[in-house]
C-alpha cells in the first residue's frame, strides 16, 4: 500500500475514534423520559410567574412590552391573563399527590407558590392584586382563574383556600 493510503486510513481512524467514545458515553447516561422532559419544561415556565406572584413581585418584575398597535387597554390585564392561563393549565398537575420524585418536589414547590399567588391576587393590599374590573378583558381572564379551581377540584390544597375562593368569587362578580 502506498504511503498516502496509510495516511488516509489513519486520518479516518483518528476521526472515528472520538465519535465511538461519545456514542458509548451517551449509552451510559440516563435517558430522560418524555414525562421528565415535559415536567421540567412546565417547571421552567411556571416557576418565574408563581415565585414572583407568591412574593407579591410579579407586577414589579414582569416587564410588559406593548405593540405599536396596542388598543389602549390597561396593561395590568396582562398579569391576570398570565396567572389565570397558567393556573388553568397547571391545576390538574398540581392536584396530583405528593411524592419524593424530582417531579413531585417541583410540583409541591409550584403548588405552595400558587396557593400564595391566589391569595395575593385578591388581596387589595398586595402589590400583585389583580385588575378584576375596569376592562372587558378581565372577564375572560377571571374565567381562567375560575377554571383552575374546576380543573383542580380534587386537590386538598385548593380546597384549603375556601376564604380565597370566596374572595375570588366576589372579585369575579365585579368584572365587566
Where does each model-flagged region fall?
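Bacterial Sec-dependent N-terminal signal peptides
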Residues: 1-27
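Ser/Thr/Asn(+Pro)-rich, low-complexity disordered segments
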Residues: 23-176
Amino acid at each position: 500500500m502506498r504511503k498516502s493510503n496509510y495516511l488516509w486510513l489513519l486520518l479516518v481512524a483518528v476521526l472515528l475514534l472520538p465519535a465511538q467514545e461519545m456514542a458509548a458515553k451517551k449509552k451510559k447516561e440516563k435517558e430522560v423520559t418524555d414525562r421528565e422532559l415535559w415536567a421540567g419544561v412546565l417547571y421552567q415556565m411556571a416557576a418565574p410567574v408563581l415565585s414572583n406572584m407568591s412574593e407579591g413581585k410579579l407586577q414589579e418584575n414582569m416587564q410588559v412590552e406593548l405593540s405599536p398597535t396596542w388598543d389602549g387597554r390597561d396593561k395590568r390585564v396582562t398579569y391576570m391573563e398570565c396567572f389565570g392561563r397558567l393556573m388553568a393549565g397547571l391545576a390538574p398537575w398540581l392536584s396530583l399527590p405528593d411524592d419524593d420524585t424530582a417531579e413531585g418536589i417541583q410540583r409541591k414547590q409550584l403548588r405552595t407558590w400558587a396557593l400564595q399567588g391566589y391569595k395575593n391576587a385578591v388581596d387589595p393590599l398586595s402589590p400583585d392584586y389583580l385588575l378584576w374590573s375596569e376592562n372587558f378583558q378581565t372577564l375572560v381572564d377571571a374565567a381562567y382563574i375560575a377554571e383552575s379551581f374546576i380543573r383542580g377540584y380534587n386537590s386538598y390544597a385548593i380546597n384549603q383556600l375556601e376564604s380565597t375562593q370566596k374572595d375570588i368569587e366576589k372579585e369575579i362578580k365585579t368584572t365587566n
